[in-house]
């Protein structure tokens, strides 16, 4: 797990990014109108940067269950760093609101540098069991069927490039039916990759 100084450093990076991203959004997006026709500008109790930081800490900390991580680690051991924390259920609702800015934040701020030896591979992101494909609504029209070494699945693929230290250099999400070699044909996926790039067949 990160030291408190590292947590503060990541928060500062995320907060600076969120402020710039909010300015960009303000200039390029239409205002959100509530169903009643009124504009809603009620801010969340937690900032987007705090939500993003907690999500980054979870994925970096080796925890398997987010609920346990949030209730037992964030709410007890990091309570002094998150004085405006919300309930677990509310946090889960807020997570999806910061997904898009978080992906951009990771892509623009947190990616590491290439050392000359890189590895590329993909992993499946299953959204439901195969028996539930026909009643699945959340990713309807986005998720597709795909096949991997473990058989058929329904969802997406995550393509990752890492260096020899295990640090992430780039990533890309695709539908499940995309061939693993397809992202390598896109120049933007291989930006800043130099030297040897190893992959399985």
Task: Go through each PLM region and give its residues.
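Short alpha-helical elements
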Residues: 1-201
């Amino acid at each position: 797990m990160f030291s408190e100084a590292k947590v503060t450093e990541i928060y500062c990076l995320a907060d600076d990014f969120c402020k710039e991203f909010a300015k960009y959004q303000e200039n390029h997006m239409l205002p959100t109108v509530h169903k009643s026709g009124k504009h809603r500008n009620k801010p969340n109790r937690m900032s987007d940067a705090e939500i993003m930081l907690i999500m980054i800490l979870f994925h970096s900390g080796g925890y398997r269950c987010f609920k346990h991580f949030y209730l037992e680690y964030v709410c007890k051991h990091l309570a002094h760093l998150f004085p405006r924390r919300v309930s677990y259920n509310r946090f889960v609702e807020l997570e999806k609101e910061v997904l898009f800015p978080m992906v951009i934040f990771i892509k623009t701020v947190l990616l590491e540098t290439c050392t000359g030896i890189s590895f590329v591979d993909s992993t499946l992101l299953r959204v439901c069991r195969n028996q539930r494909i026909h009643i699945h609504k959340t990713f309807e029209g986005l998720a597709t069927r795909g096949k991997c070494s473990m058989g058929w699945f329904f969802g997406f693929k995550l393509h990752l490039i890492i260096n020899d230290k295990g640090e992430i250099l780039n990533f890309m999400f695709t539908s499940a039916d995309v061939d693993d070699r397809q992202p390598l044909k896109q120049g933007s996926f291989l930006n800043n990759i130099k030297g040897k790039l190893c992959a399985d067949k």
